[in-house]
């Protein structure tokens, strides 16, 4: 005979079974597992044979229930994500796109100092929800963005009662997921403070995809991209020449984002979003056991990769997928996974075009950042008035006024001045802490006079804060530096992090530096200052939350063409699929004098594009902060082509990706903010091709197309300055066929009549 308590328990089991059969497609199975487990624990204490049989049956039922998969679809049904635990309690996920498997069952989890969320987990609860909103960015590629996803949150519990929520958001173009550890039922030793040792996120791919990648490195993302099969990735063979801190992690470690193309025509981008208070994610490549990418977090100076405080979350791990390459470039998923704007009054944020004292430091036989040929500089002991200048200093009062005049004449918003402040004599390669004070100008730069002159001309000045990697020094002096900017009316600053990081042992992409970049952008926002960060961690969509972060470099920019083996012609056709997925890049386009032997006989360096392609980059390489990077005197030689740079917008109401193939070509059309005028950019790699530009995106009516294109004999290496300009009438039924030279492009202004 069964006692009353046992009879009651069996009745409960029966009711749970009935409910499961009725509601099994919902989240209840997780609740059943939890309740049945408690029942099993009680029954195990009983000693009768009947009880043992019941325990065996319940154990089987518990196993079946707990292996139930949780599935969530995108709003349009194209993307499917399934979460389940293995029999060992290991969390796994799988991703499909249009019934094609994109990510095979892949492990998930975190290893902490206080717990291991990688196995022996049980499902406690599962919740699903739908979210749909439309929001307007302060600036951007489109006027409004729809944020529409279905969410699944699974709650897992370890044997020591700590809990882990894994939150999935599934969009029509992909999925993002993140980890949210918490104390759960463990009140004795809560996760108030904890350390992350490792993240166990896998991306198990379905085949030997083509990959567009750069080698894993904790302190630089300024490598040229490689295009290989996953099985042919060998990071240690990559050339890091010209990169100040270019130590490669290992032969099978690459950086995210990575762009992939499968044999069956799927385009897959793997990255992260909302990187805050956490190290950046590299990817370890394993092709010995299938084709698997595994998270590799950038370490810090100590034993842990991250130090966290509850409540906390990791960045989103993102997978964007489509059968069209154009959809990858059109995706807003990274932005949508970031928090809404945190700045109450954004009136001070204005997209803009600028010129600057910068390129003349890169080309041969021109200017320098430093003022004198001296060594052993100690800032506090220097009498700069007594120092003999070497005569090559670029940031002089007169030279700055020349740039201000050019900006005022041609309608540019601002002038960047690099090398204005003392300390450049020993700024690189010494791991020195006291390099700059960010407030003291060189003797030949009259800050008062220059600021007043710019004000009279209606031109803003952009401040420059190069840190040389000495971040502790910058943080100590930042308030004083900002006060100087406010005094002289500076509204924007370009920061730089060339060199090894101080605190010593930290990395550019580690948690400590990610926290620093966040402190800087927040402090600048508080002081109503716009920010352009060079050599930071690559962006992950944080400009939604802090739109004063106008742009970052965080990749191999145009400057490398002046003094290294340069950027291959395919470079600009890969960057939008990789680095620019996380945010705008200050690529510094607009170089009209491509060959460096113009400045120095026999110099082999050159920009690996035609002049027309440099114009097209203002459209294909999105940024609300665009530089006309060449010397003013070079623009004066090509004023008809320069007109496009003067005309092109930097803020947009609409963007249409017309053609795209990573590593080969891109054609993009953008509609200027509050205007009927469109601009088109088309670029190609080292192969010439014909761009097919369907103008059906135009409204009804007649337009005048001003077309800047490669000349008949143009070639990025042999004849880069050959271009043609033509004007023709078009409408929305017009399809343009434009020949792009090798390494070439075209730029078009479409003005409604």
Predicted features and spans:
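Aromatic- and carboxylate-enriched substrate-binding clefts and catalytic-loop regions
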Residues: 418-606, 610
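An acidic-aromatic substrate-binding cleft motif
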Residues: 309-402, 410, 414
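Glycan-recognition and catalytic regions of carbohydrate-active enzymes
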Residues: 154, 630-679, 713-719
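C-terminal beta-strand-rich structural cap/linker in extracellular carbohydrate-active enzymes
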Residues: 727-753
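N-terminal accessory beta-strand-rich subdomains and adjacent acidic, glycine-rich linkers
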Residues: 71-344
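Carbohydrate-binding surface patches
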Residues: 662-703, 747-749
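Bacterial Sec-dependent N-terminal signal peptides
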Residues: 1, 7-20, 27-71
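Catalytic domains of carbohydrate-active enzymes, especially glycoside hydrolases
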Residues: 399-420, 487-491
């Amino acid at each position: 005979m069964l006692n009353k308590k046992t009879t009651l328990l069996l009745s409960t089991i029966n009711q749970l079974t009935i409910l499961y059969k009725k509601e099994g497609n919902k989240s209840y199975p997780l609740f059943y597992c939890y309740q049945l487990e408690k029942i099993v624990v009680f029954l195990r204490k009983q000693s009768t044979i009947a009880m043992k049989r019941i325990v065996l049956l319940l154990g089987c039922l518990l196993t079946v229930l707990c292996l139930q998969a949780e599935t969530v679809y995108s709003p349009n049904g194209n993307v499917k994500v399934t979460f389940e635990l293995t029999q060992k309690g290991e969390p796994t996920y799988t991703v499909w796109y249009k019934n094609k498997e994109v990510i095979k069952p892949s492990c998930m989890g975190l290893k902490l100092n206080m717990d291991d969320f990688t196995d022996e987990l049980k499902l406690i609860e599962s919740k699903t929800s739908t979210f749909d909103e439309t929001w307007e960015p302060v600036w951007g590629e489109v006027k409004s963005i729809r944020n529409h996803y279905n969410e699944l949150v699974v709650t897992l519990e370890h044997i020591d009662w700590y809990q882990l929520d894994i939150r999935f958001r599934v969009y029509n173009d992909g999925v993002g997921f993140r980890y949210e550890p918490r104390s759960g039922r463990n009140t004795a030793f809560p996760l108030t403070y904890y350390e992350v040792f490792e993240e166990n996120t896998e991306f198990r791919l379905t085949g030997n995809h083509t990959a567009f990648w750069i080698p894993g490195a904790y302190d630089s993302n300024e490598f040229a991209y490689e295009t290989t099969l996953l099985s042919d990735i060998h990071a240690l063979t990559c050339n890091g020449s010209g990169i100040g801190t270019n130590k490669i992690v290992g032969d099978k470690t690459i950086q995210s984002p990575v762009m992939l193309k499968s044999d069956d025509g799927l385009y897959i981008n793997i990255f992260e979003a909302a990187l805050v208070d956490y190290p950046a994610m590299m990817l370890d490549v394993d092709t010995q056991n299938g084709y698997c990418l595994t998270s590799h977090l950038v370490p810090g100076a100590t034993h842990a990769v991250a130090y966290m405080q509850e409540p906390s979350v990791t960045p989103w791990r993102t997978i964007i997928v489509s059968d069209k390459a154009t959809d990858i470039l059109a995706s807003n998923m990274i932005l949508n996974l970031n928090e809404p704007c945190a700045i109450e009054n954004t009136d001070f944020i204005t997209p803009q075009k600028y010129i600057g004292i910068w390129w003349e430091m890169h080309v041969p036989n021109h200017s320098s950042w430093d003022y004198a040929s001296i060594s052993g500089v100690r800032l506090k002991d220097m009498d700069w008035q007594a120092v003999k200048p070497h005569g090559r200093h670029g940031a002089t009062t007169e030279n700055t006024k020349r740039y201000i005049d050019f900006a005022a004449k041609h309608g540019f918003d601002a002038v960047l001045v690099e090398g204005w402040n003392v300390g450049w004599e020993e700024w690189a390669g010494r791991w020195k802490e006291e390099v700059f004070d960010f407030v003291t100008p060189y003797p030949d730069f009259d800050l008062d006079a220059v600021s007043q002159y710019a004000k009279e001309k209606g031109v803003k000045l952009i401040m420059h804060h190069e840190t040389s990697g000495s971040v502790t020094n910058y943080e100590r002096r930042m308030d004083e530096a900002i006060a100087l900017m406010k005094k002289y009316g500076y509204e924007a600053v370009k920061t730089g992090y060339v060199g090894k990081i101080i605190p010593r042992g930290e990395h550019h992409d580690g948690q400590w530096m990610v926290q620093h970049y966040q402190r800087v952008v927040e402090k600048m926002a508080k002081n109503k200052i716009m920010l352009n960060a060079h050599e930071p961690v690559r962006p992950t969509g944080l400009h939604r939350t802090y739109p004063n972060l106008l742009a970052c470099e965080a990749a191999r920019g145009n400057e490398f063409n002046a003094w290294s083996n340069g950027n291959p012609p395919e470079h600009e056709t890969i960057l939008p699929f990789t680095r620019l997925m996380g945010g705008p890049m200050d690529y510094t386009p607009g170089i009209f004098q491509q060959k460096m032997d113009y400045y120095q006989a026999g110099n082999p360096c050159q920009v690996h594009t035609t002049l027309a392609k440099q114009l097209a980059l203002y459209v294909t390489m999105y940024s609300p902060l665009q530089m006309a990077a060449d010397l003013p005197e070079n623009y004066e030689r090509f004023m008809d082509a320069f007109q496009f740079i003067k005309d092109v917008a930097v803020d947009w109401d609409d963007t249409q990706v017309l053609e795209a193939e990573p590593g080969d070509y891109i054609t993009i059309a953008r509609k200027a903010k509050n205007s009927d005028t469109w601009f088109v950019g088309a670029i190609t790699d080292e192969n010439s091709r014909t761009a097919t530009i369907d103008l059906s995106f135009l409204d009804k009516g007649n337009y005048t197309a001003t077309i800047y294109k490669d000349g008949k004999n143009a070639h990025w290496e042999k004849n880069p300055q050959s271009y043609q300009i033509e004007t023709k009438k078009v409408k929305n039924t017009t399809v343009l066929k434009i020949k792009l030279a090798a390494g070439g492009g075209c730029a078009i202004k479409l003005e409604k009549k």
